[in-house]
Amino acid sequence: MAQVRALHKIMALFSANSIGAMNNSDTRIAGCFLTGIPGLEQLHIWLSIPFCIMYITALEGNGILICVILSQAILHEPMYIFLSMLASADVLLSTTTMPKALANLWLGYSLISFDGCLTQMFFIHFLFIHSAVLLAMAFDRYVAICSPLRYVTILTSKVIGKIVTAALSHSFIIMFPSIFLLEHLHYCQINIIAHTFCEHMGIAHLSCSDISINVWYGLAAALLSTGLDIMLITVSYIHILQAVFRLLSQDARSKALSTCGSHICVILLFYVPALFSVFAYRFGGRSVPCYVHILLASLYVVIPPMLNPVIYGVRTKPILEGAKQMFSNLAKGSK
């Protein structure tokens, strides 16, 4: 094992020197090396095991959730359509990062082309769509609880189509300037990214140019986009909870709180780790070791995708019943 690792290091250094030599003054670099989790190299194999388990669980859970929603006509409602979008985004996020990270942790395959790095970064930061979908789900619950008689007339198929289009456009519009800014930077010979995957500032720090605009754009995009979504979601749930506690029927109140509870769990699972990671990175400084930042970021791309299907499967009765029906139909069909 030690000889294999030594060989990988020699090959990596040779490739790095070759790439650097070709790019002394180029605006682009041929490729990048991802370090994995620096400071924990001896634990890479052991760390890869829980990451692999969580990734497989996330794929299976979200895959089942999407199949249940698509196969059961009773679940072809706005809330479940948005939930299937969230599950699809979770699969995209974890699949964009984990296979490459596991190849790095297991085999030391750390090289990734520059275009591949930009592509990975694009899909990772495409998670802005998570925020837009969570906002759409909050709006759905707001209409269902605060204006139940108008629910069908407000959330028509046409309106849902517009919401889906807006969520996708929202993410593309935010991400394209980041790609443009990175493409037009001048890069140095150093092409090592201390991370398990490519992200905006990790790539920007490889540049010899001034990256102030990248820093400010990233901060502005996060604050104006995600911050606005958080504010609107909070306002929606304040109105929702006010309406729920005004309900006279105890059963109706319990059902509404159960549905909203699932949504709130998913919202907290998405925003709390993200905000903690951002604030720890920006204000933790040297007091928080680098490997802690990278470990948290790596966990963030697998833990929410792994837990979201569990939260909805356990707490949402129609999905649980739909899953039972789907597996029952599959069992009958196999006989």
From Swiss-Prot:
S-S bonds: C117-C208
The subcellular location is:
Cell membrane
Tell me which domain of life the UniProt entry assigns to the organism this sequence originates from.
Eukaryota
A GO cellular component term found in this entry reads:
plasma membrane
Q: Which residues lie on this side of the membrane: Extracellular?
A: 1-45, 96-119, 180-215, 278-293
**InterPro entries in alphabetical order:** GPCR_Rhodpsn, GPCR_Rhodpsn_7TM, Olfact_rcpt, OR51/52/56-like
Write down the Gene3D superfamilies for this protein, in alphabetical order. Rhodopsin 7-helix transmembrane proteins
**Keyword annotations of the record:** Cell membrane, Disulfide bond, G-protein coupled receptor, Glycoprotein, Membrane, Olfaction, Receptor, Sensory transduction, Transducer, Transmembrane, Transmembrane helix
Q: Which residues are glycosylated?
A: N23
Function comment: Odorant receptor.
Q: Which family does it belong to?
A: Belongs to the G-protein coupled receptor 1 family.
Query: What is the official name of this protein in its record?
Result: Olfactory receptor 52B6
